Amino acid sequence: MAEQSDKDVKYYTLEEIQKHKDSKSTWVILHHKVYDLTKFLEEHPGGEEVLREQAGGDATENFEDVGHSTDARELSKTYIIGELHPDDRSKIAKPSETLITTVESNSSWWTNWVIPAISALVVALMYRLYMAED
């Protein structure tokens, strides 16, 4: 059952949130806040199915991956019904770290200057030969 603190914030347990994962009641967690998206299902630009796949669980990573607009973020605030209970916050899987591989640029003056210079020289010679035939 939801608990209330002194600040009138309703806290929901993860177990309670997981019960709301169908089209009659669709709740998701975003940044430890609980959203009731039931009335928004048909209005969602990405389609109802996208929200239903995340229903009853943490949708933070997927929400951020999509790159929602400022308007979408403002609209989402109207669907907040409470927060995930602090005791359950550690139960949510943290997003896996994304490894970014960078390629060190070992390109030398050879590839940056000599090859383009030779290519330009060849094109100039071919042009000159072509013009000489006329």
From Swiss-Prot:
Protein's UniProt name: Cytochrome b5
What keywords were assigned to this record? Acetylation, Electron transport, Endoplasmic reticulum, Heme, Iron, Membrane, Metal-binding, Microsome, Transmembrane, Transmembrane helix, Transport
What job does the chain carry out? Cytochrome b5 is a membrane-bound hemoprotein functioning as an electron carrier for several membrane-bound oxygenases.
Top-level lineage group: Eukaryota
CC per GO annotation:
endoplasmic reticulum; endoplasmic reticulum membrane; intracellular membrane-bounded organelle; membrane
Q: Topology in the membrane? A: Single-pass membrane protein
Q: Does the keyword Transmembrane helix apply?
A: yes
The cellular location(s) given in this protein's UniProt record come to: Endoplasmic reticulum membrane; Microsome membrane
N-acetylalanine (modified residue): where? A2
Please list every transmembrane segment annotated in the UniProt record, as residue ranges: 109-131
The text of the family note is: Belongs to the cytochrome b5 family.
Q: Which GO terms describe its biological process?
A: response to cadmium ion
Task: List N6-acetyllysine occurrences by residue.
Answer: K7, K10, K19
The Cytochrome b5 heme-binding domain extends over 9-85
A GO MF label = heme binding
Chain positions recorded as heme binding sites: H44, H68
The answer, when asked if Signal is one of the entry's keywords, is no
